[in-house]
């Protein structure tokens, strides 16, 4: 179909580290990947630098592993063993608390509800989507299998994800170098924004996706 639909979901603070107890942006030293095996926690930082906090991709990775290890239930509630102290990535320094998980659940619910509504407004079903493109620092660090495991993206789309990197800069370069800048401007003019707050189904979808 001609034109584009766009929307936005209020999920940035959780994935940018701003609302996390030990959060940080996707900078050198940020914990980007977490693995849990037999109760032991291992991690990897960006640039293999000394750990300074956990970024959005690290949170997604940790929650996927915590779900797999049955450290939380389908409501996101931590098991009794971890309820008070959370999951310690680095004891005494970097921890994922119950409050952090709740922040993730809100962000995840906003994204999944927004995606469902956007696809529905376009007249498609989720299984008909050919590609899911992720951009930015958060997307470039994300483990797609773990993003599906943490419920951030639909499992049926996991194999169709494309990582774009810094799409803003790439897009500007394309525009500057394009011989058809007017055509690009016309494409932008045919873009329609979907305001999620005005969508009757948003609240129900948000609540549905709040649980795993």
Please report, for each region that a protein language model flagged, where it lies by residue:
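Helical "lid/coupling" subdomains associated with nucleotide-phosphate turnover
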Residues: 1-212
């Amino acid at each position: 179909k001609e034109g584009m639909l766009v929307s936005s979901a209020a999920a940035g603070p959780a994935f940018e580290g701003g609302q996390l107890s030990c959060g940080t942006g996707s900078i050198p030293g940020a914990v980007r990947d977490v693995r849990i095996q037999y109760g032991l926690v291992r991690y990897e930082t960006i640039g293999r630098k000394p750990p300074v906090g956990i970024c959005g991709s690290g949170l997604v990775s940790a929650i996927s592993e915590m779900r797999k290890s049955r450290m939380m239930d389908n409501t996101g509630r931590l098991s009794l063993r971890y309820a008070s102290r959370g999951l310690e990535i680095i004891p005494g320094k970097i921890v994922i608390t119950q409050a952090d998980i709740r922040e993730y659940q809100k962000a995840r619910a906003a994204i999944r509800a927004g995606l469902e509504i956007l696809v529905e407004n376009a007249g498609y079903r989720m299984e008909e989507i050919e590609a899911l493109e992720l951009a930015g620092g958060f997307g470039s660090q994300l483990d797609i299998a773990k993003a599906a495991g943490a419920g951030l993206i639909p499992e049926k789309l996991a194999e169709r994800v494309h990582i774009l990197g810094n799409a803003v800069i790439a897009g500007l370069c394309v525009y500057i170098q394009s011989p058809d800048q007017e055509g690009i401007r016309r494409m932008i003019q045919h873009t329609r924004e979907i305001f999620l707050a005005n969508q009757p189904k948003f609240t129900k979808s948000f609540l549905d996706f709040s649980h795993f």
